[in-house]
């Protein structure tokens, strides 16, 4: 299996990307096609004693920066690592694409270069979010700011397929993010979406979920528009960072705190592991014809390695094919209702 990796994307590229790719080659047996400034990549590998075994390098001369306007960058920076990598994926030179680069550029590129599945106009950005009981899939978390009920139904179908095929959870539960659990709550659009989700085939819809209940991890998939999802995601990240910081401050405050830390060290380590987003890989653009994974911009080697693992699982389980079948079933059901 060949996974195309953007060597120039992210705050710590190319060093962290190279390290993560090398670990993935060794642990998962994949071939990595690294796209980027080949001279810089080889020099970085040599300076950091990183093996290039199992990697094929494709040279490119441009990089899409975080400050670049996404659509314009995709059109004008034809020799950038993102555009070259996505074109390689489209041409069948690899099985999936992983990048820690610009989210906006990846979203535009996934739509215009890789193209989308039938029934999908723009892919949804989805991510596994750490929670109390178990991590849940949140979508959309930033790519589609405004969504009609029909789009939310498609998100629910794709999210359910992802959690089932990639996370291995049978019959995953799906909830709609809202300001109340009752059917009567929410905007007219959310009320309409609730009714549509109740009759959407192929999903186990359990109703609305309030933001205060989302972190409990009692459902497998939380569906919402990209604006709401981005707020949920960033608030969750902020609260987690604050709580871990407060714990550290408490343990270091005095001798009693330091003794308490020694007694609770194992539990604290487990908590940090559970809350570490890098453990879950990246955020897939669900609805693209082939797997496109967005790793966190600040990813170190572990995050890149796990994003490659995630891409491998998507390919092995034919995620895109499964989603297309489910979307076709949804379209047929909606046509029958008309």
Regions found by a protein language model. Name each.
Residues 1-42:
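N-terminal phosphate-binding or glycine-rich loops at protein starts, especially the Walker A/P-loop
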Residues 5-15, 143-153, 294-300:
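Short, glycine-rich nucleotide/cofactor-binding loops
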Residues 13-17, 79-92, 96-110, 117, ...:
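Short glycine/serine/threonine-rich phosphate/pyrophosphate-binding segments
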Residues 15-16, 31-33, 39, 145-207, ...:
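Glycine-rich phosphate/diphosphate-binding loop of Rossmann-like nucleotide-binding domains
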Residues 25-28, 46-54, 167, 197-203:
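Short helix-capping segments at alpha-helix termini
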Residues 50-94:
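Phosphate/nucleotide-donor binding subsite
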Residues 111-124, 128-138, 218-222, 226-336:
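Glycine-rich phosphate/nucleotide-binding loop
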């Amino acid at each position: 299996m060949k996974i195309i990796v953007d060597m120039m994307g992210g705050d710590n590229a190319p060093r962290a990307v190279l390290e993560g790719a090398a670990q993935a080659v060794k642990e998962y047996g994949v071939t990595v096609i690294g796209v980027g400034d080949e001279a810089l990549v080889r020099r970085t590998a040599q300076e950091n004693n990183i093996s290039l075994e199992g990697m094929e390098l494709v040279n490119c001369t441009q990089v899409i920066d975080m400050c670049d306007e996404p659509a314009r960058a995709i059109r004008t920076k034809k020799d950038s690592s993102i555009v070259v990598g996505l074109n390689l994926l489209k041409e069948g030179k690899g099985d999936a694409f992983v990048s820690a680069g610009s989210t906006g550029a990846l979203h535009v590129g996934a739509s215009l270069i890789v193209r989308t599945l039938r029934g999908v106009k723009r892919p949804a950005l989805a991510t596994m979010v750490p929670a109390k009981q178990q991590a849940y899939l949140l979508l959309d978390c930033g790519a589609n700011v405004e969504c009609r009920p029909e789009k939310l139904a498609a998100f629910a179908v794709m999210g359910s397929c992802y959690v089932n095929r990639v996370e291995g959870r049978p019959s995953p539960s799906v909830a709609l993010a809202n300001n109340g659990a009752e059917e009567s709550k929410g905007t007219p659009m959310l009320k309409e979406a609730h009714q549509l989700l109740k009759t959407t085939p192929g999903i186990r819809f359990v109703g609305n979920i309030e933001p205060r209940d989302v972190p409990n991890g009692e459902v497998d998939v939380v569906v919402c528009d990209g604006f709401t999802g981005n707020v949920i995601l960033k608030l969750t990240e902020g609260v987690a960072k604050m709580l871990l910081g407060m714990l550290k401050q408490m343990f270091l405050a005095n001798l009693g705190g330091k003794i308490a830390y020694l007694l609770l060290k194992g539990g604290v380590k487990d908590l940090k592991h559970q809350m570490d987003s890098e453990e879950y890989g990246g955020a897939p653009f669900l609805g693209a014809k082939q797997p496109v994974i967005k790793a966190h911009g600040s990813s170190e080697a572990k995050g890149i390695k796990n994003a490659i693992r995630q891409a491998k699982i998507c390919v092995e389980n034919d995620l895109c094919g499964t989603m297309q079948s489910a979307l076709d079933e949804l379209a047929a059901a909606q046509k029958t209702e008309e």
